[in-house]
């Protein structure tokens, strides 16, 4: 008797719940067809975004792992130690200080000529100065750019037509010397310019990148 009574009460509760749902009086979490359709669309969009993020992560993990600090041997996760060491190498790579002998030779060469030497002459100067300490062709190029910028800052602000023509000639020669080698080293001064470069040099680099 007790069992039948409980079953009867349960069936009665179910009937009342169905009746409330039909009348819209049930306050439970029931979604309409429109809400279900919106939810399906949101789930589909989320799945597409997840797939794109996975592809992006895989592509970044496989692109230059040593320079980006990512270590594929550890599952492709970001390695902060590797990233910090890589950034340290980049920041200290261009901190070159000439020796006293190198500086004397560079000053004498600068006094003999005018402006920045061409690519071949820079290579010869770097070879000569390498006997007195560590130096690269990029160091030589940047030194002449810095030296030329310092000289211009010391000159009066008035410029003649001849001076402007000389600047155009030097800029043309710099572009030609940069394009001779075709290697990355030729463009290191563009990617990592020295902080002492003058505004004229930065403007000439911008014009070179546009052409």
From Swiss-Prot:
The protein's role, per its UniProt record: Acts redundantly with WOX4 downstream of the TDR/PXY receptor kinase to regulate procambial cell proliferation and differentiation in vascular tissue, independently of any role in vascular. Involved in the regulation of gibberellin (GA) biosynthesis pathway. Positively regulates the expression of the GA biosynthesis gene GA3OX1, and negatively regulates the expression of GA2OX1 during secondary growth, which increases bioactive GA content in the inflorescence stem. Promotes vascular cell differentiation in the inflorescence stem.
Gene Ontology molecular function terms on file: DNA-binding transcription factor activity; transcription cis-regulatory region binding
UniProt note on tissues of expression: Expressed in root vasculature, pericycle and stamen. Expressed in the procambium during stem maturation.
The family this protein is said to belong to: Belongs to the WUS homeobox family.
Cellular component, GO, one term: nucleus
SUPFAM superfamilies (alphabetical): Homeodomain-like
Gene Ontology terms: biological process: cell division; phloem or xylem histogenesis; primary shoot apical meristem specification
Note: Overexpression of WOX14 increases bioactive gibberellin (GA) production and induces radial growth with strong lignification of vascular stem tissues.
Keywords assigned by UniProt, alphabetized: Developmental protein, DNA-binding, Homeobox, Nucleus, Transcription, Transcription regulation
Matching PANTHER family: WUSCHEL-RELATED HOMEOBOX 10-RELATED, WUSCHEL-RELATED HOMEOBOX 13
Gene disruption: observed consequences: Retarded growth of the primary root, and partial sterility with aborted and short siliques. Late flowering under long-day conditions. The double mutants wox4 and wox14 exhibit reductions in vascular cell division.
InterPro entries: HD, Homeodomain-like_sf, WOX13-like
Predominant cellular place of this UniProt entry's protein: nucleus
Keyword Transcription regulation belongs to the record: yes
Segments of this protein annotated with the region Disordered: 147-183
Subcellular location: Nucleus
A Pfam family reported for this protein in Swiss-Prot or TrEMBL: Homeodomain
Record-linked PROSITE patterns: HOMEOBOX_2
DNA-binding positions: 91-155
Protein name: WUSCHEL-related homeobox 14
């Amino acid at each position: 008797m007790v069992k039948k009574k409980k079953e009867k009460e349960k069936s009665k509760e179910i009937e009342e719940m169905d009746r409330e749902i039909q009348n819209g009086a049930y306050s439970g979490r029931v979604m309409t067809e429109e809400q279900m359709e919106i939810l399906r669309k949101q789930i589909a969009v989320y799945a597409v975004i997840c797939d794109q993020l996975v592809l992006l992560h895989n592509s970044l993990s496989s692109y230059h792992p040593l320079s980006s600090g990512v270590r594929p041997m550890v599952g492709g996760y970001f390695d902060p130690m590797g990233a910090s060491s890589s950034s340290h190498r980049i920041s200290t790579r261009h901190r070159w200080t000439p020796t006293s002998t190198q500086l004397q030779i560079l000053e004498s060469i600068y006094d003999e000529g005018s402006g920045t030497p061409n690519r071949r002459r820079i290579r010869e100067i770097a070879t000569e100065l390498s006997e007195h300490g560590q130096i690269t062709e990029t160091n030589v190029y940047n030194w002449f750019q810095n030296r030329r910028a310092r000289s211009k800052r010391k000159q009066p602000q008035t410029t003649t037509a001849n001076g402007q023509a000389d600047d155009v000639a030097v800029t043309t020669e710099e572009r030609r010397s940069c394009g001779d080698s075709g290697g990355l080293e030729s463009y290191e001064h563009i990617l990592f310019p020295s902080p002492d470069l003058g505004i004229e040099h930065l403007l000439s680099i911008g014009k070179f990148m546009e052409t």
